[in-house]
Amino acid sequence: MIKRTLLYLFAFAFLIQTIFAQNEENIIKEAFDRFSKSPFTSIYSSGGAFYSGDDVDQMPLLINYYMNGTSKYISAVDGLFGGAIMNAQVIKNQLTLNVPEEEPIKDNFNNFSLEAPIMRFPKVYADILDYKFIDLDKKILSSNLTLGKNWHTLKIGYADRVDTIIFSASTYRIRNISIAFMNNLIDITLGSYTTINNIPYPKEFIIKSKTDKRELRYNITNVLAGENAKREAKKLGW
């Protein structure tokens, strides 16, 4: 009788473990399907941001962003004086970055990085504005999923960094993404969601850099998709 009970317990434990493993496999597959590509073919967003760091406190910025297929455009303007801070475009993965009084920078967008830790990986921020969180253009060395009651945690290891994505167990809505590289950690909190063409989209981004204590708070006031995005971007010559 005891042996039979033990057999039942082992069989039950094996069944639970198998179901759990299958559930985890399904969730990680769904996460990769959702987060490795943008749900939009075209998206335009604009809004205001406040930057703190480098002895600057709450410097206002006006930001415009546009993605159309594989092409991306972004501009940042001084929110007080209206002067251009930067504008960039990416065509077929080739970046052209223009900064006042500097020669244009041209580089492969996948490999481009900046010295300032908070802006180390510009492509990450462009992807996030596309609502994309896993970069299949880079080789993924590891992936690990931790299941939670309300929120799941997915860790993606690349050669130069480890991204941690926290998303809703029920809706797959992203709450937070952090980027660990060298001795630094960039933490990005997404909030105040709206819907574009019935697709959830965040209107608030809070970006913090652990090492250099820099912070960028970005609030999107206008976001459009599809033909509406194309029409709005055309007004900027994009």
Locate predicted features.
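Bacterial N-terminal signal peptides that target proteins for export
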Residues: 1-9
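Flexible, processing/modification-adjacent segments and terminal tails
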Residues: 22-30, 97-163, 234-238
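Extended lipid/amphipathic-ligand handling interfaces
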Residues: 62-67, 88, 92, 189-195
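Gly/Pro-enriched, hydrophobic low-complexity segments
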Residues: 143-237
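Hydrophobic lipid-interacting interfaces of membrane-associated proteins
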Residues: 48-54, 79-82, 102, 182, ...
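Bacterial N-terminal signal peptides
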Residues: 8-17
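N-terminal leader/targeting segments and the immediate start of mature chains
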Residues: 17-70, 235-238
